Amino acid sequence: MIGRIQGTLVSVHPPRLLVDCQGVGYEIDVPMSTLYQLPEVNQKITLLTHFQVREDAQQLFGFATEIEREAFRQLIKISGVGSRTALAVLSGMSVNELAQAIALQEAGRLTQVPGIGKKTAERLCLELKGKLAPDLGITGGKPQAIEATSEVLQALLSLGYSEKEALLALKQIPPETSVSDGIRMGLKYLSKP
């Protein structure tokens, strides 16, 4: 198995890179989050990789961080989620956003990713629940904190704020905040001009 590639970045044609490693050019598919962290062409690059062998193809997938690679590996374990879909998920949201959506069972956030329908999003929430955050070392929070965050989100939505506004406000609230303090802080943030 190929676990890491270090070489010179030759070309970028999203989502594919060409990396020269001692005279051998490796085509590597990467999520958008990794593309944003790339150096300039002809610069040195190191990518963590996942090597996939199927009966009709051998593919390399590259990631800037171990957390991204592990999230990819968790995603492709799910029935009906292939490597392309897993890359689309990691391109559409950060690993922390994915872990939070799974922890809060927010299938609606996952359907915003191109190629992810309602059934697939629900399957992701069901099958990754309790797996993603602990495996990746992501602090999804204690169950009480997750419950409080969900209640704050619901309160802001019921007050007429859009999901986008409510999620922006949630990012400003510390994870261990109580529901009432979270709502107060969220409203204060949203009332700023």
From Swiss-Prot:
Key words of the record: Cytoplasm, DNA damage, DNA recombination, DNA repair, DNA-binding
Coiled-coil ranges (or none): none
Domain I: region residues: 1-64
InterPro entries, per the entry: DNA_helicase_Holl-junc_RuvA_I, Hlx-hairpin-Hlx_DNA-bd_motif, NA-bd_OB-fold, RuvA, RuvA_2-like, RuvA_C, RuvA_C_sf
Biological processes per GO annotation: DNA recombination; DNA repair
Keyword DNA damage among UniProt keywords: yes
Start and end residues of each stretch annotated as Flexible linker: 139-143
Region annotation Domain II: where it falls in the sequence: 65-139
Record region (Domain III): 144-193
GO molecular function: ATP binding; four-way junction DNA binding; four-way junction helicase activity
Record's GO cellular component terms: cytoplasm; Holliday junction helicase complex; Holliday junction resolvase complex
Gene3D superfamilies: 5' to 3' exonuclease, C-terminal subdomain, DNA helicase RuvA subunit, C-terminal domain, Nucleic acid-binding proteins
Keyword DNA repair annotated: yes
Subcellular localization, as worded in the UniProt entry: Cytoplasm
CDD domains linked: UBA_RuvA_C
Domain remarks in the Swiss-Prot or TrEMBL record: Has three domains with a flexible linker between the domains II and III and assumes an 'L' shape. Domain III is highly mobile and contacts RuvB.
Functional description taken from the UniProt entry: The RuvA-RuvB-RuvC complex processes Holliday junction (HJ) DNA during genetic recombination and DNA repair, while the RuvA-RuvB complex plays an important role in the rescue of blocked DNA replication forks via replication fork reversal (RFR). RuvA specifically binds to HJ cruciform DNA, conferring on it an open structure. The RuvB hexamer acts as an ATP-dependent pump, pulling dsDNA into and through the RuvAB complex. HJ branch migration allows RuvC to scan DNA until it finds its consensus sequence, where it cleaves and resolves the cruciform DNA.
SUBUNIT field: Homotetramer. Forms an RuvA(8)-RuvB(12)-Holliday junction (HJ) complex. HJ DNA is sandwiched between 2 RuvA tetramers; dsDNA enters through RuvA and exits via RuvB. An RuvB hexamer assembles on each DNA strand where it exits the tetramer. Each RuvB hexamer is contacted by two RuvA subunits (via domain III) on 2 adjacent RuvB subunits; this complex drives branch migration. In the full resolvosome a probable DNA-RuvA(4)-RuvB(12)-RuvC(2) complex forms which resolves the HJ.
Family, as annotated: Belongs to the RuvA family.
Protein name according to UniProt: Holliday junction branch migration complex subunit RuvA
Species for this entry: Polynucleobacter asymbioticus (strain DSM 18221 / CIP 109841 / QLW-P1DMWA-1)
Lineage, uppermost ranks: Bacteria, Pseudomonadati, Pseudomonadota, Betaproteobacteria, Burkholderiales
